[in-house]
Each structure stands twice: as structure tokens, then as C-alpha cells.
Amino acid sequence: MATHQQTQPPSDFPALADENSQIPEATKPANEVQQATIAQDPPTSVFKNSEPIREDQIQNAIKFLSHPRVRGSPVIHRRSFLERKGLTKEEIDEAFRRVPDPPPSSQTTVTTSQDGQQAVSTVQPQAMQPVVAAPAPLIVTPQAAFLSRFRWYHAILAVGVLAASGAGTAVFIKRSLIPRFKSWVQRIMLEEETDPLKKADAKPSLAEEAVAAAKAASAAASDVARVSQEMMITKNEERKYFEDLTHLLGVQVQEMKSLSNNIRKLEGQSNNIPKIYSADQEVYNGSVTTARKPYTNGSNVDYDTRSARSASPPAAPADSSAPPHPKSYMDIMSMIQRGEKPSNIREINDMPPNPNQPLSDPRIAPKSKPWDYGQAPQDESSNGQWWQQKNPRSTDFGYETTTAARFTANQNETSTMEPAAFQRQRSWVPPQPPPVAMAEAVEAIRRPKPQAKIDQEAAASDGQSGVSDELQKITKFSESGGDGSGGIKIAEIQEETEQQHISQEGN
């Protein structure tokens, strides 16, 4: 530890020397430590990187250390401050080397005035301040002594006192203050209720208004809920009525559909009565002429053929989406509208025959008529007229009936009833029919129906047993040739048919 050498002041200032000798011993070691840290330079380390010293930072540190207030502060505080500012240890040491701390003897300065008078001024450094803080441990000692005298039973006693005081306070509030407060509130409420003037003049409070508004809102909500519930019930009833109405309408529509279907069936059955057709049937002006069906016994029974029903089911209604004519027909019609002539169509002479034209001598035998089937070929002179002879080709159509005999009887009967002019008109022989324009149509007409379609018709006719029975009766009657009770049987058939019509309409 370095020793501090005091410079002896001149003999002219004995008092100053005495004052310096009276410096407290506590401050001397501090100054000695400060000067020792400045005098002793730390040895440079071999492993430490040598960095260049920043002159500007050193100048700032010198200015900081040269400040009079900073000079009295401890060296440790000054070093830590400079380190926080970013100065290295070498720079701090260099700054302290350039600005050394003044020795303690330099704290006493002598000033000489111009007039020769001397004035002694003593500057007390800030390093003397820690000497005042020396009696601080004397203050802490009484507190430690007081704490040492505090015991655990003191804490228990304090807790007991606090608990007793709290319990007493609670009992006092419960038995004295609360009953008085309640009685005071009740008295005020009774005064307000018994005073009618105040009650009449007093305006409702916000709470009362809120309660009244809430009651009104709840009443309105209940009314709305009741009205909405009634509306829902009414709507449900209306929906039920509407569903019942739609159901009744649907039932009526179904009945109307069934009635229309029955009417169509009846119309189809009346139009599909079995008749005897051939390819050589005579057609004039779009109307087919057929004679009444006589019977071999000479009886001429005229009955309504529409009263009988056909065994075949009515034709299925055509699909509305399908075109009314095939594509080939539409193509031909479009070609005709454009003025083109189709390749497979021949022009036909459809001019009406000349009634004044004399009859030509036929070179070939006339074609047989439908009623000539079933007769043996005989000579015209011996067997009557030519239309009564049987054509050998009649078996091609599959019809072998006794209509020739019936027609003969009918001819004999009607010849006496018809006038002479009508008989002369019937004696006219029509010309030959025009050639067939579409052979495919004739072939389709003559071609028998496929077995699948026949099965479908048979299945559809199972539900029409009554109609089939009537047709069987009519067929048997026609095959028997008609006996004496023919008129009675036909009348019975007509009555049964009318009864079935009435029963279907009732359903």
C-alpha cells in the first residue's frame, strides 16, 4: 500500500498545518486507496487483444473527470459510469492518468489578494460525506433489540383481541343497529301508504313505470300469441278443407275418367262389330253400302247392330306426343307441297264414270261378292244371277258363310217392296275398282295379326265376359241360320245389353 507524502506548507501558515493534522483518520484510508488504484497500473495481459485507443472518447472522459462535482465521487462510481458509456479499460486508465486525483494537502488553498492580505479557504471534499453516515449502525441496533423482545404469545394475544372486538361489533350491529334501521324503514313506508294526498300527488317512480310497461308488454305478447295460435288453427282447418275438396275433386275426376273410358269402350265396341269384309268391297264417295243380313229361312230380322259389343278390346288411345302420321307419310306430303312427285306413286284416274256410256261386253267373268261364298260353281242359266255364284278364290279370305242364301231370300223379299226405278238403278254394274296405289297397305290389311297382339286382346277381353257372351249368342244365332225364335233371341240380347249399360252408368 503506497504511503501518502504530505507537502509541508510554509511556516507562514501554521494554522493550516494544524487543520491538516486534524483530518479524520477515516478519510485517510479512502484517499490512499484511490491514489493506490491510480498509481498501480494493471499488468497487460498476453491474451488480450490490443485495440486502438479512441482519442475522442478519452477527451470526453477527461472532461467528465475534470468536473468539480465528479472529482469528489468515488473512483469505482466514475469507472462504472465510463464503462457504461462504452469506454474500454485502457481508455479509462488513460483518462485517469491524464486527470489525476489531487492529493489531500491540495485541498487547502492559499489566496493572496492584491493588497497583500491573505485569505485561507478550506474546501471540504465530497469524500468526507461517508464520515457522517458512520453512526447509521447505531439506529439499526434498537430495532433489532425491539424485535428480539417480541414473542409468539404476543401474536396470539393480538389475534384474540381482534377476534373478540370483531365479534362484539357484529353482535352490536345485529342487535341494536339493524332492528332500529328496520323499524325506521317500516315507519316511513306506513306514512307513505297512509297519506292519501301524497299518494295521489306522487308521480310513479321509474321502477313502477318499468313494471307497468313490462305488464303491458307481456299482455300484448300474450294477445299476439293467442291471435297467432288462432290463425294457425284456422289455417290448419282451411288446409284440411282444401285437402278434402281436392280429394273430392280427384274422386270426381277419376269417376269422369272412368265414365269417359266406358263411353269410349262402348263406342269402340259398337264400331268393332264383326263384319265380313273383302278386298273387293264396293266403296262409293267414301260410304260403304251393305245390305241387311237375311237368313236362309226367309226371315228378315232388322236389329240395331250397335247394341252388340265386340269381343276385341277398344283401341288404345293414341299418344298425344306421337305424330298423327308416320314419317314416310310426312315426307311424301312435304314433297307434294314442294311440287315434287314421289317415285313410288302413280297417277290414278279418279274421274267419275260416265253414266251415259254404254255397257261393254265383259270378256272375263265378274268377281265374286262376299255373299257368294259357300256356293258351288254353277251355270248362270241354271243357277240364277252371276252374283249368286261362288268364286273359287273366296277361300283365300277364310270366309265360308251362308250369306248367299240369305241374300237370295232378301232379294226376293225386297224386290217386291222396292220401286221399279230403284231396281233399275241396282241393275247397273259398276266399273272395275282402280288399281291399288300402295301395295304395302293392302298387304298389311290382309296379313293376319301377330300372336302377341292376339294374346293381349284375349287378356283384355277377360274382363268383358258379358260382352263375349252376347257376341257368342249373336254368332250362334247367325250360324244357326235363324229359326222361328230369332226375333225373341235378339230382343233378349238387346235387353241384356241395355241392363249392362245401365249398371255401368250407375257404377
UniProtKB/Swiss-Prot annotation:
Q: What stretches pass through the bilayer?
A: 153-173
User: Topology: which residues are Peroxisomal?
Assistant: 1-152
Instruction: Tell me the disulfide pairings in this chain.
Output: none
Question: Which residue ranges have biased composition labelled Low complexity?
Answer: 308-322
Q: Give induction info.
A: By wounding and hydrogen peroxide, but not by jasmonate.
GO CC, sorted alphabetically, is: cytosol; mitochondrion; peroxisomal membrane; peroxisome; plastid
Q: Where primarily located? A: membrane
Which residue intervals make up region (Involved in interaction with PEX5)? Answer: 58-65, 78-97
Q: Where in the cell is it found?
A: Peroxisome membrane
A biological process (GO) annotation for this entry?
peroxisome organization
Q: In the UniProt record, does the keyword Calcium occur?
A: no
Ranges per topology, Cytoplasmic: 174-507
Please report the record's description of how this protein sits within the membrane.
Single-pass membrane protein
Q: In which tissues is it expressed?
A: Expressed in flowers, siliques, leaves and roots.
Where in this protein does the record put region Disordered? 1-52, 288-329, 344-394, 409-435, 448-507
Family named by the database record: Belongs to the peroxin-14 family.
The entry describes its oligomerization and partners as: Interacts with PEX13; forming the PEX13-PEX14 docking complex. Interacts with PEX5 (via WxxxF/Y motifs).
> Protein name, please?
Peroxisomal membrane protein PEX14
The organism named in the record is Arabidopsis thaliana
Q: What gene is this protein translated from?
A: PEX14
